[in-house]
Amino acid sequence: METSLGTITKAIAGAKRIFLDTAIVIYYVEQHPTYAPLLNPLFELDDIEVDFVLSPITLAEALIVPIRLNDWDAYHKLADFMLNAPRTAFILIGSEAAKLAAEFRARYNLALTDAFQIAVAITAGCDAFLTNDKGLRRVSELSVLVLDDLCMSEANGC
């Protein structure tokens, strides 16, 4: 049986910079019982040489539920991870990413937030985009890794 470490490291092999979509951040920070065991090795092992990229969209999306619930502990944990975690870059959205987002919105009919996330990943030089959104698989400009697909490659699922 393959371990979570084996599955995740195999999936990211060769990647030096990975964009983290919103769900991935939430699953890790909140230690989602299904997905955290697969994600933990990415963030907790020193021998994985990869940097992570986040955008203002990731930050805004992740903070909506804690704000609605007045859960300031969750709010601060999420914000602290996204803004201060080691090997993590918070990339602002510039005009190049905005133009690219428009192209992706038109080409793939993505939601504008998804188009922006993909555009930031590309302009930030990411090799891969880690998400749990199966609809983003159709983007061909970079490697889209869907967490549920990685779970399916585990012997017992996630």
Which positions does each model-derived feature cover?
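Structured helix-beta-strand junction loops
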Residues: 14-15, 48-49, 85, 125, ...
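Conserved glycosyltransferase catalytic-site signature
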Residues: 22, 56, 114-118
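Short, well-structured N-terminal submotif of metal-dependent ribonuclease cores
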Residues: 1-54, 67-76, 134, 151-158
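Active-site neighborhoods of divalent-metal-dependent phosphate/nucleic-acid chemistry enzymes
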Residues: 2-7, 13, 88-128, 134
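Short acidic, glycine/proline-enriched helix-loop-strand junctions
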Residues: 73-100, 106-108, 113, 136-158
